């Protein structure tokens, strides 16, 4: 996956400033807010308490949450895949699968390969199960945050009929505030900044003008978060 290059940024911003009848700013000072409730929300909770908040939120977003350990992760994963009817499996090319001892070969999983180009999309389209890790997990909203990059295509969590997120317990944070802070810190190393950041809150949910819930129109029909104790 090639990183994009921004062209004509200066002239674009200069044109905006000109139409606003001002000089183009060379530096932006972030405002100091008097009140920052976002910094305090849920921050006093332990990791176990955050997990409980996440569990409760999953009930509202039609998502199953399963707890397991590194010793039992393969058995748990097999049970979830079987519950979803088995079928073709696609997963990220992510060293964390090996770190956690997850045996993807047991499910004959297709591993996303940048060199295979369009074949990745074709497999993702027909796959029944897509599996990724969660990089940051937001307890308040039940959201998994995925940092896409080489070997970590967006289609793995988008195109299959069902989706499984492996959630290391240590990745659970109170809310998006903490995720944004992490992203700001990552900006210091722009060479390794993710090519895409996706926030996924359970299966695909849509509603028409009559507010009738429709599941699976823009993504997976079902989703499971497997929370695993870190090594």
Curated annotation (Swiss-Prot):
It comes from the Bacteria. GO terms for biological process: lactate metabolic process. Gene3D superfamilies: NagB/RpiA/CoA transferase-like. InterPro entries: FTHF_cligase-like_sf, LUD_dom, LutC, NagB/RpiA_transferase-like. Belongs to the LutC/YkgG family. Is involved in L-lactate degradation and allows cells to grow with lactate as the sole carbon source. This is Lactate utilization protein C. It comes from Macrococcus caseolyticus (strain JCSC5402) (Macrococcoides caseolyticum). The lineage of its organism: Bacteria, Bacillati, Bacillota, Bacilli, Bacillales. The gene is lutC.
């Amino acid at each position: 996956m090639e990183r994009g290059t921004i062209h004509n940024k200066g002239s674009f911003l200069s044109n905006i400033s000109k139409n606003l009848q001002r000089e183009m700013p060379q530096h932006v000072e972030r405002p100091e807010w008097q009140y920052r409730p976002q910094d305090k929300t849920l921050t006093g909770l332990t990791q176990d308490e955050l997990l409980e908040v996440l569990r409760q939120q999953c009930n509202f977003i039609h998502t199953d949450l399963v707890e397991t350990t590194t010793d039992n992760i393969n058995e748990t994963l097999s049970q979830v895949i079987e519950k979803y009817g088995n079928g073709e499996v696609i997963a990220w090319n992510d060293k964390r699968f090996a770190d956690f001892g997850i045996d993807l070969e047991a499910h004959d999983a297709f591993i996303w390969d940048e060199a295979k180009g369009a074949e990745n999309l074709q497999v993702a389209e027909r796959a029944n199960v897509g599996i990724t890790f969660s990089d940051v997990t937001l307890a308040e909203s039940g959201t998994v945050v995925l940092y896409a990059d080489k070997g970590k295509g967006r289609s793995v969590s988008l195109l299959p009929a069902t989706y499984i997120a492996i959630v290391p317990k240590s990745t659970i944070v109170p809310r998006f505030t903490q995720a944004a802070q992490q992203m700001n810190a990552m900006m210091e190393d722009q060479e390794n900044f993710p090519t895409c950041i996706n926030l996924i809150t359970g299966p695909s949910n849509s509603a028409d003008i009559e507010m009738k819930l429709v599941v699976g129109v823009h993504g997976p029909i079902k989703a499971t978060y497997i929370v695993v104790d870190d090594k």
